[in-house]
């Protein structure tokens, strides 16, 4: 019985007007952070694809030791 009383009190607390506004604000911030993080990951993966598809750099110029 104590559990159900605690659950109903908790539900009453979370459905009060101020708390629902607060929870919506926190949820909105979390969604914005998630979208920003996904965009960041997408940009990084696209940058890596461009870098990986570039042709390899030529070997450094070396002077040969034989004189002909």
UniProtKB/Swiss-Prot annotation:
Superkingdom classification of source: Viruses
Keywords from the UniProt entry: Host membrane, Membrane, Transmembrane, Transmembrane helix
Transmembrane segment boundaries: 21-41
Lineage: Viruses, Varidnaviria, Bamfordvirae, Nucleocytoviricota, Pokkesviricetes
Subcellular location: Host membrane
Key word Disulfide bond present: no
Coiled-coil annotated spans: none
Family per similarity comment: Belongs to the asfivirus KP93L family.
Assigned GO CC terms: host cell membrane; membrane
Further comment: Encoded by inverted terminal repeats (ITR).
Record-given protein name: Uncharacterized membrane protein KP93L
Bilayer topology annotation: Single-pass membrane protein
